[in-house]
Amino acid sequence: MPQDMNYSTDNTRIIDRKKVPAPYELINKLPIDNEISRLVYGTRQEISQILHQKDDRLLVVVGPCSIHDPDSALEYARKLIEQNINYKEELLIVMRVYFEKPRTTVGWKGLINDPDLNETYNIGKGVEMARKLLIDLAKLNLPAGTEFLYPISPQYITDIISWGAIGELQKAKFIES
């Protein structure tokens, strides 16, 4: 081996790099207003009351396995809103809005990780799409729930989430981080 040659030994398997906005940058770009804050805060309080059996309604978190198309999600949301109105005395309906795929080792990784469904992994675009969809749902007066898979994801969207879950398979990831 030549003595004067530079050998690259760092990040030898990285093909591409894309900028991911810092959470505060995206929150400043897509802020929530007082009405959305009121919806999220109020729904969190209602969920707490239901879980502590101080509210007789049933909490229903319902929606698709994962979101891949915001327009379809909004169409689904409009149907849920009708049910939320019809059953408001018996149910508190929260739309399940999962953006990441926890059990997928191959294939699509979810809207946040691969918003274009083509393995380009434009995470910056994905977190922006996720945040915008949540704002649109809140403007429809529909609370949203999601599963948090990685410690960074909540930093972008937790202010618009009324109900959150950490899946059984994901606990170790939070501990390791």
PLM features: residue spans?
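N- or domain-start disorder-to-order transition segments that initiate the globular core
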Residues: 10-54
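N-terminal beta-rich core of secreted/periplasmic extracellular enzymes
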Residues: 36-49, 81-94, 100, 130, ...
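A short helix-to-beta-strand connector/capping loop
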Residues: 55-56, 89
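Short glycine-rich or small-residue beta-strand-to-loop segments that form or flank ligand, phosphate
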Residues: 57-68, 94-98
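Glycine-rich anion/phosphate-binding loops
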Residues: 67-87, 120-132
